[in-house]
């Protein structure tokens, strides 16, 4: 697992992102996507939902990027979960505005099969930017949102949890 600072990232805008996306989409449709997962401390299902996908994406030659605001990923948890520790990159201790920008840049590069970002509520413009970046980079982007950011006025939301034991 590699931990990177925001100021020492290896985001490079190369032709790889566009050419790789074009080569992998024979039907002319983009394959990238953005999805949001809302979780809380009492529902551990997100791990069971995400792990098989993350394990499969870990078999690609590309990296798995975790943009985490405060936590540091546990190397032991990564190993026990069957994730390729050598392909996991983590950026931590960045504010949410920088996280949106970092996620967009990472998705665009095509160097990451998946980018997980812990983000606050996004504007439609931010969502569109991330969706386009995921499509161009042929990558999956998961917007992770703690339940505390849910507005109760909008009714009940299905929620998922990432256990704090995933971090150390």
Swiss-Prot record:
HAMAP family: SulA. Interacts with FtsZ. GO terms for biological process: division septum assembly; DNA repair; negative regulation of cell division; SOS response. Belongs to the SulA family. Residues 106-112 are annotated as: FtsZ binding. Keywords: Cell cycle, Cell division, DNA damage, Septation, SOS response. This is Cell division inhibitor SulA. It comes from Serratia proteamaculans (strain 568). Component of the SOS system and an inhibitor of cell division. Accumulation of SulA causes rapid cessation of cell division and the appearance of long, non-septate filaments. In the presence of GTP, binds a polymerization-competent form of FtsZ in a 1:1 ratio, thus inhibiting FtsZ polymerization and therefore preventing it from participating in the assembly of the Z ring. This mechanism prevents the premature segregation of damaged DNA to daughter cells during cell division.
